[in-house]
Amino acid sequence: MHIKFKWLSFGSLSLVYATMIMGVYLSSIHKSLSCPDWPLCPNGLFRLPEQGYIIEYIHRIFVILAASMIYITAIFAYLKLKNMQRLTILASVLVTIQILIGALVVTTKLELMFVSIHLPVGVALFGITLLTFLFFLRKTSTSTMYK
């Protein structure tokens, strides 16, 4: 059907998962505020970060990549796959909310309310990207199964 959508949705899922793993790792080593500025770390986007916040820097790069992939997937679904629009639009809304919550986590210096919301929204985003990928696979496998 649309092999591009398969790879876009899988790419979104993979990038969201990798971003979550990095975020959990940062939390577990107590380095969530190793890069205290938002949206960029003190060295900016294109200069190599200092050793103290390289994981946080990579986490933010992955956020940019994941969000971009999710938005591109939603645009593709809007233009080509009407039956996938709702899930991809929901993923786009969730990733936008997640970015805003992440900004609040950093700018409020780990305010408990925002930290407490950040992970569940990420889990919901992961779930929606997983459902998008699985529903598309199911639809394509059942549509080709009976031909």
Tell me the role of every PLM-derived stretch.
Residues 1-147:
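Polytopic transmembrane helical bundles with strong interfacial aromatic enrichment
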